[in-house]
């Protein structure tokens, strides 16, 4: 879940 959020932020 956190990984997906990180990608979205980028």
Swiss-Prot record:
Family note: Belongs to the class-II aminoacyl-tRNA synthetase family.
E.C. numbers: 6.1.1.6
Subunit structure: Homodimer.
Gene name tied to this protein: lysS
Recorded GO MF terms: ATP binding; lysine-tRNA ligase activity; metal ion binding
Class of the enzyme per the UniProt entry, highest EC level: ligase
A single GO cellular-component term on record: cytoplasm
Keyword Cytoplasm annotated: yes
Cofactor(s), names only, from the UniProt record: Mg(2+)
Cofactor note: Binds 3 Mg(2+) ions per subunit.
Source organism (scientific name): Campylobacter upsaliensis
A biological process term (GO) from this entry: translation
Domain of life, source organism: Bacteria
Alphabetized UniProt keyword annotations: Aminoacyl-tRNA synthetase, ATP-binding, Cytoplasm, Ligase, Magnesium, Metal-binding, Nucleotide-binding, Protein biosynthesis
Catalytic activity reported: tRNA(Lys) + L-lysine + ATP = L-lysyl-tRNA(Lys) + AMP + diphosphate
Stated name of the protein: Lysine--tRNA ligase
Subcellular localization, as worded in the UniProt entry: Cytoplasm
């Amino acid at each position: 879940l956190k990984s997906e959020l990180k990608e979205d932020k980028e």
